[in-house]
Curated annotation (Swiss-Prot):
The keyword Nucleotide-binding applies. It comes from Cenarchaeum symbiosum (strain A). InterPro entries: EF-G-like_DII, EFG_II, EFG_III/V, EFG_V-like, G_TR_CS, P-loop_NTPase, Ribosomal_Su5_D2-typ_SF, Ribsml_uS5_D2-typ_fold_subgr. GTP binds at residues 27-34, 93-97, 147-150. This is Elongation factor 2. Residues 711-730 are annotated as: Disordered.
């Protein structure tokens, strides 16, 4: 019998860490994550059992319920009883749509296990692979729930034997992901198996599930499942095999408790001294160790203000406690410690290591921050996002008086969602909002309107990047007063280092020795590493190549400022630069400090960088999306025709049941009218999704037109600037 546990009872159970599990639900969009999660909530008494599968209680944002997809990650604390043992299970339901994959990545840092939900008919899809890879990179152990088994019975009308064969094929394909992405020591140990009940089958919509353990205990066979549907006895099947028993039983059996998981996860996500007292406390998940927590999500609550949600890896967090927000180099006071029961926040006073607290009062905290009772400790490794903001819109208030309110709302949105980027265009004064895709931006604009700010938005536009494919000799630029000379050259930066900068693995916020070691691992010599002047998170570097020159040290900030300005907006189209390695080779400064301040050296540095880029020759990069289309087999040719007309290409085609899955690539700039054309060519029978795959050079056939279009919409002169506008002669 389901019994709802009070907060006091839950707190009593979690004193024993063996009784805690932290897991997330991850999946391809529309494979049934949130519907499954509802059944688990009903089992714990948080929603009515009759509403499970319909309430979408984990989609407690109005936008989520209207769209029928999960946009935010929602976390909840569940109670589960297995025979005589009681467990507290912290569950996070994550978005499935690729535009919100950043939220999935941050959630994975907080959990130790993942239930991967997969449609029995569609099988392993692109986003299934992506989220599973993310989980394995975070050393989060996956188990598999094959959902929508009712489709095999009602749509495909499979026999028990054929049904088992189909399910076994899904399991095999899933294990291939582990062969590809799991670290060697876990590759075999973490493979899922029907025989050990790390695979569960069921229907989240109909609220039943079975695995080997349930089948043995209840005497259920696949024939019984088919008979339940053919004889209209699904309710009896639900009574014998409720979904929550099978799924939560699988979680308890195969996912580790926090003190076990942290022994192998901490060395991966925290690069401090593991032999220190701090390191030992993290590895052991000690309640009496220093308080150390990583924030994975910020929620703005109308009543409580900022709520910082994260994983407490060490120590105990209490109401009224002062913590150091390490990344921000500030202190904050925890007003109250809470956990979530659905969309209800429960104040608990304190929580120990291994839990997922929700802290009120830390307004200066952001997702990714490390909180600690000890100042100056090593921060947790940053999370690596699989995509970048590639689509943008311009936003302005319909009524000018609402501008301050719009600025405030946008600030709140970027606190909640670090993948949303807001900037002011200095030329036009427009507010530009960039996101992972059109849906991401659509949701953001709805949030602004929900805040009672009427806005006008532009059509969505693609973000581009600029880079260099070759190097150049040093060029010279003078300051506005003509009294200072800066010499600069550029060459391509190793892509691996660019990726490490963008992921935050290499950062000026990190320990200098650790940064030096990482750069040496990439082949840089000791002297070059010592001379790093500036690390740009967009994926660019500046090296100090000067020798025996006066005033370089005191001029560094000004020169770095000019470098930063050049990296924000490259010379070709004023798009961000990436993968560029600059060397500041020589400096001829004015002797009087009054003549070599920021107003002089900043512009000179920017001009020198721009001159070097144009001398080397810049390339324009566009985002390329991977696309996956599910379509009736006789319409595969129509899909290929659409992709070809959009400068895309088909990479592969496989048949799955009555349909075929076409995978390919397409430039992001060609996707704005793709829905209409795909519907027209396939009579509305195609279902497709796409996600960012890589940056690629714009083909010469489209380059001139692309440059012209970008410069025109930015209000720039038709032609890019020339080298002579940035470099000076002796």
């Amino acid at each position: 019998m389901v019994k709802f546990k009070s907060t006091e009872q839950v707190l009593k159970i979690i004193k024993n860490k063996d009784q805690i599990r932290n897991f997330g639900v991850i999946a391809h969009v529309d494979h049934g994550k949130t519907t499954m999660s509802d059944s688990l909530l009903a089992h714990s008494g948080i929603i009515a059992p009759s509403a499970a599968g319909q309430a979408l209680a984990m989609d407690f944002d109005k936008e989520e319920q209207e769209r029928g997809i999960t946009i935010y990650q929602a976390n909840v604390t569940l109670h589960y009883t297995q025979k005589e043992d009681e467990y507290v299970i912290n569950m996070i339901d994550t978005p499935g749509h690729v535009d919100f994959s950043g939220r999935v990545i941050r959630s994975l840092r907080a959990i130790d296990g993942a239930v991967v939900v997969c449609d029995a008919v569609e099988g392993i899809m692109t986003q299934t692979e992506t989220v599973t890879r993310m989980a394995l990179e975070e050393l989060v152990r996956p188990v598999l729930f094959i959902n929508k088994v009712d489709r095999l019975i009602k749509e495909l009308r499979l026999t028990p034997e054929k049904m088992q064969e189909t399910l076994a094929s899904v399991v095999s394909n899933f294990n291939q992901l582990l062969d590809t992405y799991a670290e060697p020591e876990y590759r075999d140990a973490w493979k899922v198996s029907i025989q050990d009940a790390s695979v569960t089958f069921g229907s989240a919509k109909d609220k039943w599930a079975i695995n080997v353990d349930v089948m043995k205990e209840k005497g259920i066979t696949f024939k019984d499942v088919i008979d339940a549907y053919s004889e209209g006895k699904v309710d009896e099947l639900v009574e014998r095999a409720p979904l929550a028993d099978a799924v939560l039983g699988m979680v308890v059996k195969h996912h580790p408790p926090p003190h076990v998981a942290q022994k192998y996860r901490i060395p991966k996500i925290w690069h401090g001294d593991l032999e220190s007292d701090i390191g030992k406390a993290l590895l052991a998940c000690k309640d009496d160790g220093p308080t150390i927590m990583m924030v994975v999500n910020m929620v703005l609550d109308k009543a409580a203000g900022s709520v910082a949600i994260g994983r407490l890896f060490s120590g105990t967090i209490r109401d009224g406690q002062t913590v150091n927000i390490i990344d921000a180099k500030r202190e904050g006071r925890v007003q109250s410690v809470n956990f979530f029961m659905g969309n209800q926040r429960e104040q608990v006073g304190e929580l120990g290591a291994g839990n997922i607290p929700a802290l009120i009062g830390l307004a200066d905290s952001r997702a990714g921050n490390t909180l600690s009772s000890i100042a100056g400790i090593k921060v947790f490794e940053g999370v690596s996002y699989v995509s970048e903001p590639v689509v943008q819109i311009a936003v302005e208030p319909k009524h000018p008086k609402d501008l301050p309110r719009l600025v405030e709302v946008l600030k709140q949105l970027t606190i909640e969602d670090p993948n949303l980027v807001v900037k002011i265009d200095e030329e036009s004064g427009e507010t530009i909002v960039s996101g992972m895709g059109v849906l991401h931006l659509d949701v953001a604009t709805h949030r602004i309107q929900d805040a009672k700010v009427e806005i006008i938005t532009s059509e969505p536009l693609i973000n581009y990047r600029e880079t260099v494919s070759s190097g150049c000799e040093a060029v010279m630029s003078k300051s506005p007063n003509r009294h200072n000379k800066i010499f600069m050259r550029v060459e391509p930066l190793e892509p691996t280092i660019g990726d490490m900068l963008r992921s935050g693995r290499i950062s000026e916020m990190k320990d200098k020795k650790e940064m030096a070691d990482l750069l040496k691992e990439q082949g840089w010599d000791t002297d070059t590493v010592k001379r790093v002047m500036k690390l740009d998170p967009r994926g660019n570097v500046m090296i100090n190549g000067t020798k025996g020159v006066q005033f370089v040290q005191e001029s560094t900030d000004s020169i770095n400022s000019g470098f930063d300005d050049a990296m924000k907006e490259g010379p070709m189209c004023r798009e961000q630069m990436r993968d560029c390695k600059f060397t500041f080779t020589h400096f001829v400064p004015h002797e009087d400090a009054a003549h070599r301040g920021l107003s002089q050296l900043g512009p000179a540095s920017r001009r020198a960088c721009m001159g070097a880029l144009l001398t080397a020759g810049t390339s324009l990069l566009e985002p390329i999306l991977a696309i996956e289309v599910r379509v009736p087999t006789d319409m595969v040719g129509n899909v290929a025709t659409v992709l070809s007309s959009k400068s895309g290409k088909v990479m592969d085609m496989i048949q799955k049941g009555p349909a075929s899955i076409v995978t390919g690539e397409i430039p992001a700039s060609e996707t704005f009218t793709l829905s209409e054309e795909m519907r027209g060519q396939t009579a509305g029978k195609a279902m497709w999704n796409s996600h960012f795959k890589r940056w690629a050079e714009v083909p010469k056939s489209r380059l001139a037109e692309s440059i012209s279009d970008i410069r025109k919409r930015k209000g720039l002169a038709p032609d890019p600037p020339t080298v002579s506008e940035f470099i000076d002669r002796e």
